[in-house]
Amino acid sequence: MIDSEIRAVFFDAVGTLLFPRTPVSRTYAEHGSRHGSNVTEDQVQLAFREAFARQEVADEAAGWRTDEARERARWRAIVADALPGANSDACFPGLWEWFSTPAAWVVPSDVRLVLRSLADRGLVVGVASNFDSRLFRLVDSFPELAPVRGRCVISSLVGWRKPARQFFDALVEAAGCERGRVLYVGDDVRNDLHGATAAGLRAVLLDPAAETLGPNRIRRLRDLIAG
């Protein structure tokens, strides 16, 4: 599926290479219950989506600028909104730390195969994500992610969140080749597919629920190395 013009392949992290081991809403509800919140998992799920969307609106209004402090602040706000009644000063640090540990995450079985296959072809591989410096710990903790170590483009460190062009400019610099020869793979239509293509990169959307497939849409990560 990857044509001969491609020289580098970068991946989104959460929802592409990394997935929460248990539903985020369940983890939040369990942590919240220890700190004064009595909301159900379903209530947390709805409140989390709404809180996350509000933070996206705020980030867009700020031109997608970010840093380590902003990422921590946005997640503190999300936790407070998703867990009404909880003592957020007590609850937030535990959740922040939990999601920095490999115990909170799982890497799908095909990730090792795909990353190794691409690296063996001589392609530059890396990860580029809206995340913070906790991602380094996660990448270092999973043997499956070894091929992307040393090429981590993280929004809080480059100063811009996807879908900002500046984020993808930093990705291209890390790739070390022309932007038209960089392929970006992710699961979000606006941030990953549209953001990358608007910046002049090639892009593929990972969409397990896709009814139809095409050159820019796959259901499984291993489809990248098929054919």
Regions inferred by a protein language model and the residue ranges of each:
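Asp-based, Mg2+/Mn2+-dependent phosphohydrolase catalytic module
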Residues: 1-9, 19, 88-92, 106, ...
